[in-house]
Amino acid sequence: WVVMKQLGFLVMFVAVGTMLSGCVSPGPTQSAVSAEEAEKITEEVTKLDQQWSQTALTKDTAFLKSIWADDLRFTQPDGKVFDKEAALADVEGNTDTVTSSVISDYKVRVYGKNFAVVAGDYHVAGKDKDGRTFSRKFRFTGVWVQRNGKWQVVAEQSEKLE
């Protein structure tokens, strides 16, 4: 009886799973847009990410305010999670003098007209407030969403490589 009961649960589980799998729409794929659209989106997002990397040198918070969505969730390598306001405060309070800010091994995946995921490596170098030189490398993944014709970052996570 116990074996039959377990078998019955297994059959029911498989049947329900099969039924539900037909109810779930597949996730967006790169085929959701034409190759031309994907290329245009890739160029736009890449340009914005490159500009973002340069704000380490310029501390252009006006630019960051424009590309960081109000609902931004930014997870730092140490596990701290910042919203937009906290991330801006972190930039404004940073006393490092950055001399180099470079993105490499950068890839964009377009999943629709309004959605892209980016990943890459980021290397920043300079001097801290005490004049000591630093060189930091990170790997990041970011989520860009287009709202009202404007691309913005809604999530970003990075981990320190060195």
State each model region's role.
Residues W1-V11:
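Bacterial N-terminal signal peptides that target proteins for export
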Residues C23-D70:
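Short, low-complexity N-terminal intrinsically disordered segments enriched in polar/charged residues
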Residues V24-P28, K137-E162:
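Short beta-strand edge/turn micro-motifs at domain boundaries
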Residues L10-S21:
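Bacterial N-terminal signal peptides
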Residues Q76, D128, Q146:
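Acidic surface patches and DE-rich sequence motifs
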Residues E39-E43, D60-N114, D121, F134-R136:
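A solvent-exposed, acidic/Ser-Thr-rich amphipathic alpha-helical stretch
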Residues G120-K127:
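Generic short beta-strand segments
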Residues V108-A116, R132, W144-K150:
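A short, structured loop/turn motif at beta-sheet edges
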